[in-house]
Amino acid sequence: ARIKSTVNSNKLYNGSDKMSYLNVEFPGGLRVDARLKNNVIKTDQPVTAGGEGGAPSPFELFLGSIATCAGIYALSFCNGKGISTEGMSISMDIEKNMQTGLISKINMDLKLPEGFPEKYRKAIVNSMELCTVKKHLQTPPQFDITTTTAK
């Protein structure tokens, strides 16, 4: 079985206007891997959920994607201003809605490097708010899931 996620592209894939963006494979156990360009994104379920815990779960990668996206904006801001990023880090914690089990709030704390100019505190937060992953949560895409038979 193979799940294929597609996005619109100017390139043709199998005679259509859609191109495969990534392919998902099932290497065994509860592991699920995504092949994206020249990279493999490995996932597994925690031991408590029957997996081996050998890689982050898809949901952990989702949260990591949000934080690293904010991080690249913070990094780019500092690089653009010539500000050292030594000692800079982001920590994230989440608040869950106990009725739904879904996240109700994501909190990120940017630890600024020593000597970070006070006048740029708000600006670096504003740059992190531009994160594309976050924007997709605010305006979610339509999901279209289909099936085909493997040959």
Each model region followed by its residue ranges:
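Alpha-helical metal-binding/catalytic segments enriched in His/Glu/Asp
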Residues: 69
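N-terminal cationic amphipathic segment used for targeting or macromolecule association
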Residues: 4-5, 41
